[in-house]
From Swiss-Prot:
Enzymatic reactions: XMP + L-glutamine + ATP + H2O = GMP + L-glutamate + AMP + diphosphate + 2 H(+)
Classification lineage: Bacteria, Pseudomonadati, Pseudomonadota, Gammaproteobacteria, Enterobacterales
Domain Glutamine amidotransferase type-1: 9-207
EC number per UniProt: 6.3.5.2
The organism of origin for this protein: Shigella boydii serotype 18 (strain CDC 3083-94 / BS512)
Binding partners and assembly: Homodimer.
Start and end residues of each GMPS ATP-PPase domain: 208-400
GO cellular component: cytosol
Active site: 86 (nucleophile), 181, 183
Pathway: Purine metabolism; GMP biosynthesis; GMP from XMP (L-Gln route): step 1/1
InterPro entries: Class_I_gatase-like, GATASE, GMP_synth_C, GMP_synth_GATase, GMP_synthase, GMPS_ATP_PPase_dom, NAD/GMP_synthase, Rossmann-like_a/b/a_fold
Pfam families: GATase (PF00117), GMP_synt_C (PF00958), NAD_synthase (PF02540)
Gene for this chain: guaA
Name the record gives this protein: GMP synthase [glutamine-hydrolyzing]
Length: 525
């Protein structure tokens, strides 16, 4: 009997902050399961979830507006600790009898708050001390409105010159509010505050660990599928690879992985996937060489969105054909992860996040009646990687830079041809190899090469040549929503350029992309 790793759980109500998923990841890092729901959940849904504590997230709206989001009243009647962050603190204050006003002094960025009263939330936590020995905390503010009067049964725990109620608390009811973001790294003691709330105040045990998650997933897979056969589309990416390893541990040879080689993968990637999963780990893999089919479908197409749709459609066709060849397959496995499925149960107000459906494999043939199994659907990407390590997958594979689903199909600009893909594969491999050799690979968030469908004149020896151009792209980012181009050393860029032009016959010029996001996107197409 496996341990119930969901026994202690935190409910996070999302009011629309860009940091809300980060709050959830921080709680998970503390070893505690949590779920992220839209703010307008019902009392029945909260009761059914039975949380050990509730966190109210930040959000972009103003509590002073008439129709702005409010926490369900039951949140404050459930008898569990509640932690309001930024907007979450403001709606807590307002709903419990305090007052919030739009502030003339908006606070964005670093601030130092002074702890003026004792509280279980921050007891013994400090970054510095005032001259008279009071604790100071370095925090990250991001708010326009501010609480101007706290509810009568709350006390002020910390303040700044412009924010008299930076932390408020009702210790008896275990309600806490902070006017800053403890989940971001700029709030230096933020993880300690979250740990104090989740582990001490809510009394949650650290049951959510990679080893226990694996045991739980294996038990649930076995319970769900029994002795049935399962099929999985294996791409070699992180999500499908970890899904494959979990299923293999749970059901062994009853798993069949279909690996479709679309001709749009990185250099030697198909061979590496087959060697690792087939030869090394002993998974049952059906290898489908389909380069000609994909390239023929892409012939003559220049539009990036049309190329994506073609690649997706052909993949589904090929996968379906292979699935039909297998006998008695009852289940389709997918590597769906938690950010793909975060949603609210039917939102009454329409203010909840739009549901994002995500399918690694598209529609299945009507004659195939299969159940769906998604072993990773509770996990964030960083958790998937940790589980992959625990399952024995190599670090370099799990922590590779992101690679787009359509592969080189969107890194060859314009029409996709085999010649272009082959040149791009070799140029990109040189760039990545040199990044690793210079210990720069893990210092940038993503790096890749783009093939430009333009020719440029070059000189080789005594002759001139008229060959293709590639662009190197490297960016630094925290969340991939915004990004800076990476300031790679000139001598490094020169070395990469020389190697590509000398070793890849057909490329005469290498350029470096110095566009940030925004205005540019990270990928060119």
């Amino acid at each position: 009997m496996t341990e119930n790793i969901h026994k202690h759980r935190i409910l996070i109500l999302d009011f629309g902050s860009q940091y809300t998923q980060l709050v959830a990841r921080r709680v998970r890092e503390l070893g505690v399961y949590c779920e992220l729901w839209a703010w307008d959940v019902t009392e029945a849904q909260i009761r059914d979830f039975n949380p050990s504590g509730i966190i109210l997230s930040g959000g972009p709206e103003s509590t002073t507006e008439e129709n702005s989001p409010r926490a369900p009243q039951y949140v404050f009647e459930a008898g569990v600790p509640v932690f309001g962050v930024c907007y979450g603190m403001q709606t807590m204050a307002m709903q419990l009898g305090g007052h919030v006003e739009a502030s003339n002094e908006r606070e964005f960025g670093y601030a130092q708050v002074e702890v003026v009263n004792d509280s279980a939330l921050v007891r013994g936590i400090e970054d510095a001390l005032t001259a008279d020995g009071k604790p100071l905390l370095d925090v990250w503010m991001s708010h326009g409105d501010k609480v101007t009067a706290i509810p009568s049964d709350f006390v002020t725990v910390a303040s700044t010159e412009s924010c008299p109620f930076a932390i408020m608390a009702n210790e008896e009811k275990r309600f806490y509010g902070v006017q800053f973001h403890p989940e971001v790294t700029h709030t230096r003691q933020g993880m300690h505050m979250l740990e104090r709330f989740v582990r001490d105040i809510c009394q949650c045990e650290a049951l959510w660990t990679p080893a226990k998650i694996i045991d739980d997933a294996v038990a649930r897979i076995r319970e769900q599928v029994g002795d049935d056969k399962v099929i999985l589309g294996l791409s070699g990416g992180v999500d499908s690879s970890v899904t494959a390893m979990l299923l293999h541990r749970a059901i062994g040879k009853n798993l069949t992985c279909v690996f479709v080689d679309n001709g749009l993968l990185r250099l030697n990637e198909a061979e590496q996937v087959l060697d690792m999963f087939g030869d090394h780990f002993g998974l049952n893999i059906v290898h489908v060489p389909a380069e000609d089919r994909f390239l023929s479908a892409l012939a003559g197409e220049n539009d990036p969105e049309a190329k994506r749709k073609i690649i997706g459609r052909v993949f589904v066709e090929v996968f379906d054909e292979e699935a039909l060849k297998l006998e008695d397959v009852k289940w389709l496995a997918q590597g769906t992860i938690y950010p793909d499925v975060i949603e609210s149960a039917a939102s009454a107000t329409g203010k909840a996040h739009v549901i994002k459906s995500h399918h690694n494999v598209g529609g299945l043939p009507k004659e195939m009646k299969m159940g769906l199994i998604e072993p990773l659907k509770e996990l964030f990407k960083d958790e998937v990687r940790k589980i992959g390590l625990e399952l024995g997958l190599p670090y370099d594979m799990l922590y590779r830079h992101p690679f787009p689903g359509p592969g080189l199909g969107v890194r060859v600009l314009g029409e996709v041809k085999k010649e272009y893909c082959d040149l791009l594969r070799r140029a990109d491999a040189i760039f990545i190899e040199e990044l690793r050799k210079a210990d720069l690979y893990n210092k940038v968030s993503q790096a890749f090469t783009v093939f430009l469908p333009v020719r440029s004149v070059g000189v080789m020896g005594d002759g001139r040549k008229y060959d293709w151009v590639v662009s190197l792209r490297a960016v630094e980012t925290i969340d991939f929503m915004t990004a800076h181009w990476a300031h790679l050393p000139y001598d490094f860029l020169g070395r990469v350029s020389n190697r590509i032009i000398n070793e890849v016959n057909g490329i005469s010029r290498v350029v470096y992309d110095i566009s940030g996001k925004p205005p540019a996107t990270i990928e060119w197409e």
